[in-house]
């Protein structure tokens, strides 16, 4: 296949459903990542129903998997046994998760579930527990969600794969307890805010290739390799997780495989061809994204160009020639010619871990811990200084708020001490306060029927008070009398 030259994008072809030409202006090219929060965070889903549907015609039947008691989930044994723990009391209303774990923080959440950082009350160790948001909607939905547990058990133990401790279902909700890892690669890149150093990229690439080689050697395909499913461990070691879309090649369920994120999808998946080469292509796009701080397109012409082996030179110009050649091997459009994980690990630049990678990780971790210690020390010194300067302010209880002293009522119209810098001739003759008050009284639209002294303002503090004239009286009359007066000839 002819490769497009630099600056000449390839035509829109190569997939069973080509993108129409009028979509070319939808995404005019490739762009950098948008600064800010999580760009891929989804809006919260509406609250799901907490109970199974109930029919009015047939008696309600509660399925066996919708029991309130927790039951262990495992595909290694034939029967599902009840979950037992020394700190769990079935008579209490709290769930097994609430009784056996201390929730510390929430690590992340998505459209289907949320992950918590917890401390086990059994052994005191830290774990991560993933809890699905909604209960099982039926047998098919339960089978689809339990597939993640089966994927973890098929993968087994590997230093670059997230380890599953146990899984259970309670009240129709699935829980997965895994080892605690650091933030995901997506969160790490968004916190970094720029392209990752190439030393880190090489280390991440080698770790995930080791995980994929372990999966592919057992005939397993991940089908959802992306930065959100790659987690950082101690000393910068990466681990691959989220095996919900895992497919075993040659099995009966391989034809019902589901695709992952379309931004990292291999082109052969659109034709229904599932293989280990799809994971290598997704990993290549992941490395291209984190190494170039590039926003991968969801579709359009840019999506087609990446599936035809086109690497945008404006992004890859800052990469080394070795990394560009590895990306070209991983993003080969033909899955038969695409390099495998085993072949990539045999390359000289990926055969052994680079020594400066470990030094970089150790220096970054030491700097992070030193900065946290410095912040804690500054906070302690500020607290001690405040206690020495104001020793009694933090010992005595706070008193009631003081009320400001009341000020005597003032009347701007009667205050003869007010002066103005304006020219008196320019604004007319000067008037005394008594004259102004009498004019205001005469211009009142609704006269009062009787003057009551308590309705007047308290002007006892004023030196001189103007004499009050007689107030006009008003005699109320009904409409009939007014109508008769109008008919009476003058």
UniProtKB/Swiss-Prot annotation:
Domain Protein kinase intervals: 101-350
Biased composition (Pro residues): 7-19
Activity regulation, short description: Negatively regulated by hyperphosphorylation during mitosis. The hyperphosphorylated form does not associate with CCNB1-CDC2 complexes. The PLK1 protein kinase may be required for mitotic phosphorylation.
Localization per record: Endoplasmic reticulum membrane; Golgi apparatus membrane
Disulfide bonds: none
Keyword NAD: no
Transmembrane regions: none
Domain of life: Eukaryota
UniProt keywords, alphabetically: ATP-binding, Cell cycle, Endoplasmic reticulum, Golgi apparatus, Kinase, Magnesium, Membrane, Metal-binding, Nucleotide-binding, Phosphoprotein, Serine/threonine-protein kinase, Transferase
Post-translational note: Autophosphorylated. Phosphorylated by CDC2-CCNB1 complexes on undefined serine and threonine residues. The phosphorylation by CDC2-CCNB1 complexes may inhibit the catalytic activity.
Enzyme Commission code(s) on record: 2.7.11.1
PTM sites of type Phosphoserine: 31, 85, 111, 134, 464, 486
The keyword Phosphoprotein is annotated on this UniProt entry: yes
GO biological process: negative regulation of G2/M transition of mitotic cell cycle
Annotated stretches, region: Disordered: 1-20, 33-67, 444-476
Active site: 224
CDD domains for this protein: PKc_Myt1
Membrane topology term: Peripheral membrane protein
Annotated binding of Mg(2+) 1, by residue: 229, 242
Catalytic activity: L-seryl-[protein] + ATP = O-phospho-L-seryl-[protein] + ADP + H(+); L-threonyl-[protein] + ATP = O-phospho-L-threonyl-[protein] + ADP + H(+)
Domain statement: The membrane-association motif is essential for the localization to membrane of Golgi stack. According to some authors, it is a transmembrane domain; the existence of a transmembrane region is however unproven.
Subunit-structure text: Interacts with CDC2-CCNB1 complex. Can also interact with PIN1 when phosphorylated by CDC2-CCNB1.
Official protein name in the record: Membrane-associated tyrosine- and threonine-specific cdc2-inhibitory kinase
Source organism: Mus musculus
């Amino acid at each position: 296949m002819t490769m497009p030259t630099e600056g000449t994008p390839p035509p829109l072809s190569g997939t069973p459903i080509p993108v129409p030409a009028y979509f070319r202006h939808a995404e005019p090219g490739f762009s950098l990542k948008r600064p800010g929060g999580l760009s891929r965070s989804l809006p919260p889903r509406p609250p799901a129903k907490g109970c199974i549907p109930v029919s009015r015609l047939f008696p309600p039947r509660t399925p066996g998997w919708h029991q309130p008691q927790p039951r262990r989930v495992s595909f290694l044994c034939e029967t599902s046994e009840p979950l037992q723990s020394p700190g769990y009391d079935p008579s209490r209303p709290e769930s097994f998760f609430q009784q056996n774990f201390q929730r510390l923080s929430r690590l992340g959440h998505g459209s289907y579930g949320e992950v918590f950082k917890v401390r086990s009350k059994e052994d005191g160790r830290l774990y991560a527990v993933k809890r699905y948001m909604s209960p099982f909607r039926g047998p098919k939905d339960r089978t689809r969600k339990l597939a993640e547990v089966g994927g973890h058990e098929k993968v087994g133990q590997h230093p670059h794969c997230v380890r599953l401790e146990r899984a259970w279902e309670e009240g129709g909700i699935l829980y997965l307890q895994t080892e605690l890892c650091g933030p995901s690669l997506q969160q790490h890149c968004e916190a970094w805010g720029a392209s990752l150093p190439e030393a880190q990229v090489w280390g991440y690439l080698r770790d995930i290739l080791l995980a994929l080689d372990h999966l592919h050697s057992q005939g397993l395909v991940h089908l959802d390799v992306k930065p959100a499913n790659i987690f950082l461990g101690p000393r910068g070691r990466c681990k691959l997780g989220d095996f919900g879309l895992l497919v075993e090649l040659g099995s009966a369920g391989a034809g019902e495989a589901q695709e992952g994120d379309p931004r990292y999808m291999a082109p052969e998946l659109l034709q229904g061809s599932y293989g280990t080469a799809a994971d290598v292509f997704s990993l290549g796009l992941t490395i291209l994204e984190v190494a170039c701080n590039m926003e991968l397109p969801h579709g359009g012409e840019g999506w087609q160009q990446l599936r035809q082996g086109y690497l945008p030179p404006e992004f890859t110009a800052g990469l080394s020639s070795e990394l560009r050649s590895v990306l070209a091997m991983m993003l080969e459009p033909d899955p038969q010619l695409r390099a495998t994980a085993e072949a990539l690990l045999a390359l000289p630049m990926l055969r052994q871990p680079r020594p400066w990678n470990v030094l970089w990780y150790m220096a970054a971790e030491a700097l992070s811990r030193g900065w946290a210690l410095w912040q804690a020390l500054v906070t302690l010194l500020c607290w001690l200084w405040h206690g020495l300067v104001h020793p009694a302010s933090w010992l005595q209880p706070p008193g009631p708020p003081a009320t400001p002293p009341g000020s005597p009522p003032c009347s701007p119209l009667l205050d003869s001490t007010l002066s103005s810098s304006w020219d008196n001739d320019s604004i007319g003759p000067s008037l005394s306060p008594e004259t102004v008050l009498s004019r205001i009284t005469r211009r009142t639209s609704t006269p009062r029927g009787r003057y009551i002294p308590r309705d007047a303002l308290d002007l006892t503090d004023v030196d001189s008070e103007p004499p009050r004239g007689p107030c006009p009286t008003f005699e109320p009359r009904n409409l009939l009398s007014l109508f008769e007066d109008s008919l009476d000839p003058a």
